[in-house]
Amino acid sequence: MSLGRPWIHDLPGKLHEAALYGYQGIELFFDDLDCLAQTCHNGSHIEAAYHVRELCETLHLSIICLQPFGFYEGLLDRNEHERLVTEKLPRWFHLSRILGTDMIQIPSNFLPADPDTGAARTTGDKDLIVSDLRRVADLGLQQKPSPIRFVYESLAWSNHINTWEECWDVVQRVDRPNFGICLDTYNIAGRVYADPASPTGKTPNADADMHNSLARLRSRTSNTAINISKIFYVQVVDGERLSSPLDENHPFHVPGQPTRMNWSRNARLFPFEQDLGGYLPVLDIAKIIFNDIGFQGWVSLELFSRTLAEPGPLTVREHARRGRVSWNKLVGVLGLRESYPCGYLGGYSLSTWTSGADSTVQHRL
């Protein structure tokens, strides 16, 4: 959750603040579940999952997905691949059922090289990547009483699948009804537009490359045009323009980690926070997703930031407030229509006009 770090800010407190600020749902980060298990349930993830579901039902919060099922596809160590499929995945299926969610998120693999030998531990072989992902999708289809969905997200620093175009190509090749894509404004712009290691904060051809990528995203006529039914949810978030390049002397630098990952972990922002340094073309991307493509569904504000590590309850409340302010601005700028269903928590759904029809989106952390 984007309100505070696990082990610093407890999950029940974050859920209460999310509800108070009118969020309808959450992406459940496994670290939050693990923290709750270790601190309150003698290490039992099962008991923690029941706890989270009961609390979310009381607060009228939906659990949209459990994430991240990471470091999975394209592993060169096929024994580790088998362990993930035969040992870890069944546990995640069980947790998902308890939590009441039907979706597991898989981020594209960014497993670093072997620390001892420097050898790569993943492959860019697209056939193997697709085969690995198709395998979990097929297992998800077999789940009872209903299938489990998987949503694939390209991270800007991943080893091989690091653009939305590559991610969409994989989703098409997997070709399973329960396997879709997550579009994230931060990761879309963070790869082709932003370069935190550059003095300008941008790649050499940032504007042209971003324009071309968005033209492909907007296109509805090409054979590779994105299928709206395959967009399982959307993340809308910005990034901070750093005052100095993120090099080895920068305080955000972590040896062995990709520069964009170090930036992401410390300097994401909610949309419309230009006063805090936001500079990515978030609105341009969002307009295409909501107005041109006509996306309907869950929208997440997935924030990672150094500010989430500040102790105290005010950190959680302030991030909940900032997220809500940001969302309200997005609603206004895109002309979304907000409506409040019954319920003391003030949860809401939002509609925007597209192609003459209502497009409903829902807000979450």
Regions inferred by a protein language model and the residue ranges of each:
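Conserved beta-strand positions in the central sheet of alpha/beta enzyme cores
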Residues: E27, C65, Q105, V151, ...
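Short, conserved active-site loops that position catalytic residues or coordinate cofactors/metal ions
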Residues: Y23-D34, I64-G70
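Histidine-acidic metal/acid-base catalytic patches
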Residues: M1-G22, T86, P145, I161-L365
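Active-site acidic/histidine proton-transfer and metal-coordination neighborhood
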Residues: G13, L55-T58, E73-L183, G190, ...
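Glycine-rich, proline-tolerant flexible connector loops at the mouths of alpha/beta enzymes
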Residues: E27-C56, S108-T117
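Feature marks short, surface-exposed loop/turn motifs that line or immediately flank catalytic pockets
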Residues: D32-D34, F69-Y72, F110-P112, S158, ...
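Catalytic-core regions built around general acid/base machinery
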Residues: H41-L59, I129-Q142, S213-A225, L280, ...
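Short coil-to-beta-strand
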Residues: Y21-Q24, C56-L66, R97-I106, F295-V299
